[in-house]
Amino acid sequence: MAKETTPDHPATELNEIQRYVTQERGTEAPYSGKLLHNKREGVYHCLCCNQPLFYSDSKYDSGCGWPSFYQPVSDDAIRYLDDNTHNMHRVEIRCGHCDAHLGHVFPDGPQPTGERFCVNSASLSFTDGENGDKTAG
């Protein structure tokens, strides 16, 4: 389970869907996330601890209903766990810093990695590269 609090963003500040996704390994409804159609340049961070996770230039429209990226900012930004729930095998992704649940990674993404990091908007915040504005997912 993800850590309940962090110095930058205590879990008590999370709304219901953000808490469900990040702390209870939940999934937001497809096509419902605030950051799904975001096309601005910047950095996507973990909502719970503000750790950088993905650059906007690795984001693409996979058509799956959740923000999709083909690579994280670094190898240690993401923690990978086997997930055998729902009678299938998947690879869960969590924040490498605070262990918040982010989503799953699949081997059907574009080059150069061939991976699709399928991430819940509710687990992310976005920092605009032009003006520094932050948007919580």
Curated annotation (Swiss-Prot):
The UniProt entry annotates the active site at: 118
The family database entries (Gene3D superfamilies) matched by this protein are listed as:
Peptide methionine sulfoxide reductase
One protein family per Pfam: SelR
Q: Which NCBIfam families match?
A: peptide-methionine (R)-S-oxide reductase MsrB (TIGR00357)
Tell me its cofactors.
Zn(2+)
Q: Which InterPro entries match?
A: Met_Sox_Rdtase_MsrB, Met_Sox_Rdtase_MsrB_dom, Mss4-like_sf
UniProt feature coiled coil, ranges: none
Cofactor binding summary note: Binds 1 zinc ion per subunit. The zinc ion is important for the structural integrity of the protein.
Q: SUPFAM superfamilies attached here?
A: Mss4-like
EC numbers, comma separated = 1.8.4.12
Q: Which reaction does it catalyse?
A: L-methionyl-[protein] + [thioredoxin]-disulfide + H2O = L-methionyl-(R)-S-oxide-[protein] + [thioredoxin]-dithiol
Gene Ontology CC terms, in alphabetical order: cytoplasm
Which GO molecular function terms does the record list?
peptide-methionine (R)-S-oxide reductase activity; zinc ion binding
Q: Which GO terms describe its biological process?
A: protein repair; response to oxidative stress
- Any keyword Phosphoprotein? no
Family according to the record: Belongs to the MsrB Met sulfoxide reductase family.
Put simply, this protein is called Peptide methionine sulfoxide reductase MsrB
Positions contributing to Zn(2+) binding: 46, 49, 95, 98
Annotated keywords:
Metal-binding, Oxidoreductase, Zinc
The protein's matches in PROSITE patterns, at most eight in alphabetical order, are given as: MSRB (PS51790)
